[in-house]
């Protein structure tokens, strides 16, 4: 399985499956992917490695709807959130929480995932080169009340999440990245050179950040690093 295919497959799979779980509100995972010397393993909340760094790619422990709906009974059980998807030497596997490879991905086992995409309530709006936040399609730019957040940021991106009424929003201010809520309150301070616009908030209630644009790590909504 080639890396590019693996990335596309993993992202689409997790995106569909994670939105069906409404019980993990702001609870971070027990095991968190962390990279060391170019390889990824998993640490616990004490930042201790539980699964040694050995993978080229490692996702959060989460459901895989392609396997959950598989016609192959033996493969179906590995769609459980008890397992995580990893990639090593361009081959994708499911592993258990001890790091054991329990399943090697096979396209023949894949089933189609039902679409669970949620329409976002809020979206970024650009005016005069600055980004704000709106919750409707038709905006009167002269009416301040038409904006949820008046345009003032260099960039805004509404992160995918379980709660569309209270999204986390990646923002750029003074060329630094941070996270705000819909009221403009700072959740993650503007101290990072980059925050990845991926599904880490949806899947793990965490943000993948970097201070130098090269090395990335996860922080929770209290900006605690892992």
Model-predicted segments: where are they?
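Residue-level detector of conserved, function-critical positions
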Residues: 19-226
């Amino acid at each position: 399985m080639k890396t590019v295919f693996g990335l596309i497959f993993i992202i689409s799979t997790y995106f569909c499956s994670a939105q069906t779980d409404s019980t993990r509100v702001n609870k971070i995972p027990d095991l968190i992917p962390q990279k060391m010397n170019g390889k990824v393993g998993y640490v616990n909340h004490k930042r201790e490695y539980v699964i040694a760094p050995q993978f080229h790619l490692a996702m959060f422990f989460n459901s895989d709807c392609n396997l959950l709906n598989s016609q192959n009974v033996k493969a179906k059980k590995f769609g459980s959130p008890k397992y995580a998807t990893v990639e090593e030497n361009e081959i994708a596997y499911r592993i258990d929480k001890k790091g054991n490879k329990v399943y090697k991905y096979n396209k023949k086992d894949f089933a189609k995932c039902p679409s669970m995409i949620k329409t976002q309530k809020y979206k970024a709006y650009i005016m005069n080169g600055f980004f704000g936040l709106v919750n409707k399609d038709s905006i009167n730019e002269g009416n301040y009340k038409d904006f949820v957040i008046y345009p003032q940021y260099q960039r805004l991106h509404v992160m995918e999440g379980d709660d569309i009424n209270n999204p986390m929003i990646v923002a750029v201010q003074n060329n630094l990245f941070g996270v705000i809520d819909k009221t403009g309150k700072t959740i993650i301070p503007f101290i990072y050179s980059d925050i990845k616009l991926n599904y880490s908030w949806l899947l793990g209630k965490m943000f993948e950040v970097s201070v130098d644009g090269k090395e990335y790590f996860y922080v929770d909504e209290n900006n605690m690093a892992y």
